[in-house]
Amino acid sequence: MIVLGVDPGLTRCGVGVIEAGAYRRLSFIHVDVVRSDPHESQDLRLLKIYDGLCAKMDEFIPDTVSIERVFAQENRNTVLGTAQAAGMAMLAAAQRGIPVALHTPTESKMAITGNGKAEKIQMERMVARILNLNALPTPADAADALAIAICHALRPSGALEGGEREQHLTPAQRQWAQATQHATRRRGVRRGM
């Protein structure tokens, strides 16, 4: 399974491509950053991001596009641009019939390090280790895109399906799956389900 990870951003949109094989074997394929000029109008910047993402999807033909879920930040303009870039990734994938998965930064950290509050350098080191890279992926947007792709490939309902899935989870993945199930049950209780 080929997973294309996207760390959305209006100025720098990270793109990471990995292959998920049997027994949680992940292989690095590609990493890049699609850039737009902050001095251009927002519509032209979004078009550059969209065109760049379309080109990557056409080149690597992923089975899934995994996008970092956008959360509200203090800077409203930043979150707006980030959300719009995420929308461009979703649109490009939908036009190609590619399934989209959204993952939070906490999910990504939990899947990769076993710690939902891991520091950026811990994430970068684990991404390099998981993908057997000789150096840390740079810039940060590129590393984050690879992390989102890895998160999707390693999640319990990602690349591994059925009985094989449970059998090959790492301790960190088991902990993450249990935490996700617990959080889902708690939300259901609060909503009166």
Curated annotation (Swiss-Prot):
The protein's assembly and partners: Homodimer which binds Holliday junction (HJ) DNA. The HJ becomes 2-fold symmetrical on binding to RuvC with unstacked arms; it has a different conformation from HJ DNA in complex with RuvA. In the full resolvosome a probable DNA-RuvA(4)-RuvB(12)-RuvC(2) complex forms which resolves the HJ.
Compartments (UniProt record): Cytoplasm
Keyword NADP applies: no
InterPro entries from the UniProt entry: RNaseH-like_sf, RNaseH_sf, X-over_junc_endoDNase_Mg_BS, X-over_junc_endoDNase_RuvC
Catalytic activity: Endonucleolytic cleavage at a junction such as a reciprocal single-stranded crossover between two homologous DNA duplexes (Holliday junction)
E.C. numbers: 3.1.21.10
Protein encoded by which gene: ruvC
Family: Belongs to the RuvC family.
Known cofactor(s): Mg(2+)
Note accompanying the cofactor annotation: Binds 2 Mg(2+) ion per subunit.
Protein name per Swiss-Prot or TrEMBL: Crossover junction endodeoxyribonuclease RuvC
Stretches the record annotates as Disordered: 174-193
MF (Gene Ontology): crossover junction DNA endonuclease activity; DNA binding; magnesium ion binding
Binding of Mg(2+) 2, residues: 68
GO process annotations (BP): DNA recombination; DNA repair
Organism encoding this protein: Bifidobacterium animalis subsp. lactis (strain AD011)
Keyword annotations from UniProtKB, A to Z: Cytoplasm, DNA damage, DNA recombination, DNA repair, DNA-binding, Endonuclease, Hydrolase, Magnesium, Metal-binding, Nuclease
The keyword DNA-binding appears for this protein: yes
Residues at the catalytic site: 7, 68, 141
An example Gene Ontology CC term for this record: cytoplasm
